[in-house]
Every structure is written in structure tokens, then in C-alpha cells.
Amino acid sequence: MEFNFASRLDSFEEGIFATLNYKKNELVKAGRKVYNMSVGTPDFKPAQHIMDAVSEAASKPENYKYALADLPELLDAVSNHYAERYGVKGIRHEEIMSIYGSQEGMAHIAMAICDPGDVVLVPNPGYPVFTAGPFLCGAKVETYDLHPENNFLIEFDKIPEEQARRAKMMIVSYPLNPVCVTAPDSFYEELITFAKKYNIIILHDNAYSDIIYGGRVGKSFLSFRGARDVGVEFYSLSKSYNYTGARMSFVVGNQAVIDKFKNVRSQIDYGIFL
């Protein structure tokens, strides 16, 4: 029997990291030494207190039920972390939601924001899901190019006026994967001004702010005045705590965006484990 599948998949092959993992395993089987420069999976173990807490929580039968809402203690911990780590004070529970890793969040949030044909601006180069998520939701993905001559920062004056006016959502990420650059304070201020001018929702992927070297400081988009008015930030435990396989992240920021995203996710899952 011959099936007809969704045409939206015609533009996609298997995810690049799955493909590279297969090739890596084949080389390892052949006795080759492989340095894995593909998906960013830390090869360090999580801190002992983290593993102990997970082990203890996994031994409690009540933790195997549906987690229909985030625990207040969890939301408090996220809010307190943002205050202590980034100086972002006063984040309310309504401005936080847990997700199955930032990859999942980025893949689904366009369902809450974009109608088919809406324009989403994504960086080039950029992480694959920045493009895949909006595209699979029917949005029109348009790239903005990042150049080494400008330290891979967005050149807002190079984004055409007509494109900016059509854009509904814009994905930004600093420190940026795969080019490992950070952004100065003036950049974030310009980003917020740009978003307000064109009424664009900003999604900031903040997965790498705790693994920065050379005297640089990882910052949160939300620490800048007006950020919560224009968007949300994805904060991941994967790289900061060597917690990649457990799939634990948060989306933090604008309550209206998070409320709509909660609505979407309530249709498709029942919360994170532990």
C-alpha cells in the first residue's frame, strides 16, 4: 500500500544530529577515534547532589502521576535563580513554564504565535530547530545573515523595512550556537527597541550563558529594560548542569506569550517527569 505523507516534510531529511550520531557510531565500530563536534552533549557527569535528588524523587510513587502544573517550589527556584544569577528580580509564577528541553519548546512555540504564512526571522548561521519549528507550523521562515566582520551580531539596519514590518516573531540567541559569540549590552537595548518599533515577538535562546570563558559574562535578555514587554527567553539545564538527557528547560518572560504557549502544551502533554 502506498501512503501520501505531509508535504511539509519534503524539505526535511532526518535531523542532522541523528545522522551524525549514526555516522559516529559506525566509525567507532570500525575502531576509529572520533571527536564529536556535533550535538552539544557534555561528557561530564552531573553534580552528585543533582543525581541524589533525582534518585530520591524517582523512588517516590507519587512522582509517577501526571504533572499537570508546575510546582510552586519549582517556579520559586527559577525566579530566585534569575534574581541571583542575572539580576532579574520579580519574575512571577505566571511568567514561567517548564518544558521538555529548549529544543521541544522552540519546536512548538510557533503554534501559539504564528498562523500559516506569518513571517519568522531566524539567524543564519543558527541552530537547526530555529528554522524547523516555525516551518513545521506553517510559518514563512526568512533569515537574517550574521557576519564575522560584525562579530556575528545582528545588523538591524540591514534588515529591510518591509521584511521587518511583516515579521511576527524573531529568534535570537547569544551566546550563539554555532559561532560562540556573546553580545554587548547595547545590542540587547537595540534589539528591544527594534522589537517594539515593529511589534515583533522575540524568542531568546539562552542555553549557553553559563559556559563562557575568557573573562566574558553570560547575560539574560530579560535583564534589560523592556525585554519582558517584547518576548520570552528559553533557559536550559542541559549545558549548565550536564543534564542534557533529562530534558529540562524553562520559558520565562512575557505572560501573554506564556499563557498562549501553556494553552498549546496542555493539548499535547501532561508536564515533565520529576
Where are these regions (language model features)?
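N-terminal small-domain helix-loop-helix segment of the aminotransferase-like
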Residues: 2-3, 8-101, 108
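Helix C-cap/helix->beta junction micro-motif
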Residues: 27-30, 137, 197-198
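PLP-dependent aminotransferase class I/II
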Residues: 47, 230-274
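Short acidic capping loops at alpha-helix termini that bridge into adjacent secondary structure
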Residues: 90-96, 116-119, 166, 228-231
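Conserved PLP-anchoring active-site segment centered on the Schiff-base-forming lysine
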Residues: 112-134
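A short helix->loop->beta-strand "cap" motif at the edges of active sites that frequently abuts
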Residues: 118, 139, 194-201, 227-229
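Active-site phosphate-binding strand-loop segment of PLP-dependent enzymes
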Residues: 142, 147-215
